[in-house]
Every structure is written in structure tokens, then in C-alpha cells.
Amino acid sequence: MKTNCEFPLLCLLIVLVANVEGEVEDTGLKMVKRLWRNWEDPEQRQLLDQEAEQEKQLEKRLWRNWEDLELRQLLNEFAENQREKRLWRNWERRQVAKEDDGEKPKELWRNWEDLKRRQVVDLNDEQKTQRDKRLWRNWEDNHATLRKRSADSLSRQKRLGRERGKE
């Protein structure tokens, strides 16, 4: 029996009283001697303190693990309830769809296909518009470059003509 007693005299008194009452026999005196030796030996006392601290840490860790387990169980129950609700709603929707003789799902499918087709057409139109804008910008840039070159060429010709006229 390991005991970490901070007050060895109190431990001695408890063991002696227990001996008198007949609850502890030979082991009581041995325990008192061991407690007293441990109290006198600082290294042994330090080891006992470390063991006590490790036991406290273990208890804390076990408690946290238990709390984590309970929380996980609650979250799993909640998720299971949500899944059951979702399954029930889906089942109800299928029942309503079956009652409509299957026309409603077919109509929804056709609407969805039409929507997808329109999205593709809109995307193609947008791409064409972007391409046309790009082509127009390129044409404008090229035209501006050509005008600038011809203006530069014209001014160069005028300058050369003036220089020739001076000669």
C-alpha cells in the first residue's frame, strides 16, 4: 500500500489508533516505519510527490478523455438525428413526386436540361462577344499604329522636301 503522507505524525497516530481498534495488525507498524523513513529521505519524498503528481495528471487526462468521448457521442447522436430527418424529408419528397404520376420529375428534368442548354448558349455568346471586343481593340490598335506611321512618314517627307528646297 503506497501512501503519500504530508504529516507523518498524523499518519502515525491514525495507524496506532487503527492498531488499537484491531483493524490493522502487523502491517500497521511496518507502514508507519516505511512512512517515517520516506519522510526522512528527501529523495524518496520527491519520488512520492512525483508519483502523486503523475496520478493527478493521469486522472485529469482520463477525465478529459471521458468528456471528449461524451461530446463525440452527443455530436454523433446529433448527426444521426440530422441524417434521419434528411432521409425522412427525401422519402416524403419522393412520395409526393410519385403521387404526381411522374410528370413533375420529368418536367423538372426538362427544365434543368433547358437551363443547362441556355447556360451553354449564354457562355458561347459571351465568349463570342469577348472575342469580337478583342478583335475590335486589335483593329483599333493596328489602325492607330498605321495612322501614326503614315503621319510620321508624311512629316518626314515634308521635312525632306523643305531640306531639298533649301538646297
Swiss-Prot record:
Stretches the record annotates as Disordered: 147-167
Molecular-function annotations in GO: toxin activity
RLWRNWE repeat locations: 34-40, 61-67, 86-92, 107-113, 134-140
Keyword Secreted applies: yes
Propeptide positions: 23-94, 112-118, 139-167
Cellular localisation: Secreted
Entry keywords, A to Z: Cleavage on pair of basic residues, Pyrrolidone carboxylic acid, Repeat, Secreted, Signal, Toxin
Keyword Signal attached: yes
Tissue specificity note: Expressed by the venom gland.
Signal peptide, first to last residue: 1-22
GO cellular component: extracellular region
Modified residues (Pyrrolidone carboxylic acid): Q95, Q119
Entry similarity comment: Belongs to the scoloptoxin-08 family.
Protein name: U-scoloptoxin-Er5c
The species this protein was found in: Ethmostigmus rubripes (Giant centipede)
